[in-house]
Amino acid sequence: MDRAPQRHHRTSRELLAAKKTHTSQIEVIPCKICGDKSSGIHYGVITCEGCKGFFRRSQQCNVAYSCTRQQNCPIDRTSRNRCQHCRLQKCLALGMSRDAVKFGRMSKKQRDSLHAEVQKQLQQQQQQEQVAKTPPAGSRGADTLTYTLGLSDGQLPLGASPDLPEASACPPGLLRASGSGPPYSNTLAKTEVQGASCHLEYSPERGKAEGRDSIYSTDGQLTLGRCGLRFEETRHPELGEPEQGPDSHCIPSFCSAPEVPYASLTDIEYLVQNVCKSFRETCQLRLEDLLRQRTNLFSREEVTSYQRKSMWEMWERCAHHLTEAIQYVVEFAKRLSGFMELCQNDQIILLTAGAMEVVLVRMCRAYNANNHTVFFEGKYGGVELFRALGCSELISSIFDFSHFLSALCFSEDEIALYTALVLINANRPGLQEKRRVEHLQYNLELAFHHHLCKTHRQGLLAKLPPKGKLRSLCSQHVEKLQIFQHLHPIVVQAAFPPLYKELFSTDVESPEGLSK
């Protein structure tokens, strides 16, 4: 009598296993909407988690989107957030529908077509794996985040993304290992623009003796010290006292460079162009679109609707938005000349430690200092919009930081170069080839100074916030996540994006460990 239940139980397990296999096979097909890595069939179409969530929110909120251009905006992984109207129209055109959640059995023709597409994608992946380079031996200890950061075969392919222009090759002068190439030159870069002269000088012997100095200047002017440019520390009372230590400022010492070969002015100018181009290609929203939307504010009723949402729903929404922003930062890093030449361990260390900091800096582009609002899900809203998160102090601190940065009147190129230096930081713990990171960081410092010198904006250096402020905001975010994770562990495990959990989530602590 027990045979029938056993047979039924075995059949159920086989069906479940077959369903999982079928789903995993479908996931090799990219999202039909934006081309990102898909996670299965959602609302009747193979899509990624981002497009699934976007379609769900558009149906729940019943929002009427509008297009500011010709209603034919390209929708791919990098541009999908630029026009919500065209993204929704593409979802509908490809067949996404709430009625398609349970669409019944596929016809044989549909199954055969799906199977053929799966096989095609698998063959392409096998070909890519055959031509892919073997990762450096020093990178094997960093495999845990390789998939979710997209530095292998995960969400963002190792090579150039299919929907973004390929990053151009890096000049050899920016990447040579120490001990190779031409000898040092005392004059590292010299530029004369519109009557202004900026002479950057470096002596390796002096550099060894001097040690690393701060690069901030009280008057913001480039001044020659004993070993080149020197800047004194600047304090910002409105942001709190900067922390002391080897990692206390946004940009490390400019004066004492690592022992690296000569980098020509041509190389430095190329690096400026590369960083700025990489930034433009990996911005979620164009600046002109953000400025155009500034008058599009959430109504009082819409703000109230957000405030009435459950804490877990708002956390899930923000986790998905933050993860998407971090994916753009990953693409930015991969396009920076020299980054992909670092060992994989160091790539992951830099991204893990710096991606959130870059997102916080980038946020100033979407912040309107006139009314203290930020662009979120299609409109501008203030701190009250995020009340349901239950972390008003953190949200206020992030808004204050964006307000401080917006007062600096960053140009797009200045944000690009600044965020590159926030990301490429040789003081991150765990680096295996620190000298190579120092080399890249030093050249980025040169590039930043060179650009500021050309645009007569050297005074900006004295106004940059202390690095301790960025670290403090990131630490507050992790602390609030730990509290939320303790209250809603299942939500974090089941609904939060894998990349977000890899970067920020920890084991659930006891209530005693979550003191205010």
From Swiss-Prot:
The keyword Nucleus applies. GO terms for cellular component: external side of plasma membrane; nucleoplasm; nucleus. Residues 119-133 have a biased composition (Low complexity). Disruption phenotype: Mice show decreased adipocytes size and highly insulin sensitivity, leading to an improved control of circulating fatty acids. Mutants are protected from hyperglycemia and insulin resistance in the state of obesity. Loss of circadian pattern of some clock genes expression in the peripheral tissues and massive apoptosis of thymocytes. Knockout mice for isoform 2 lack all lymph nodes and Peyer's patches, as well as LTi cells. They also show a reduction of T(H)17 cells in the lamina propria by at least 10-fold to less than 1% of the T(H) cells. A zinc finger (NR C4-type) spans 31-51, 67-91. Induction: Isoform 1 expression oscillates diurnally in peripheral tissues such as liver, brown adipose tissue (BAT), kidney and small intestines. Isoform 2 is induced upon antigen receptor ligation in the presence of IL6 and TGB1 (via STAT3). Induced by TGFB1 in T-cells. Residues 1-30 are annotated as: Modulating. GO terms for biological process: adipose tissue development; alpha-beta T cell differentiation; cell differentiation; circadian regulation of gene expression; lymph node development; mucosa-associated lymphoid tissue development; negative regulation of thymocyte apoptotic process; Peyer's patch development. Residues 109-118 have a biased composition (Basic and acidic residues). One of its GO terms (molecular function) is sequence-specific DNA binding. Expressed in immature Vgamma2 gamma-delta T-cells (at protein level). Expressed in the liver. Expressed in the heart. Expressed in the kidney, jejunum, and brown adipose tissue. Interacts (via AF-2 motif) with the coactivators NCOA1, NCOA2 and PPARGC1A (via LXXLL motif). Interacts with the corepressor NCOR1. Interacts with CRY1. Interacts (via AF-2 motif) with PROX1. Interacts with FOXP3. Interacts with NR0B2. This is Nuclear receptor ROR-gamma. It comes from Mus musculus.
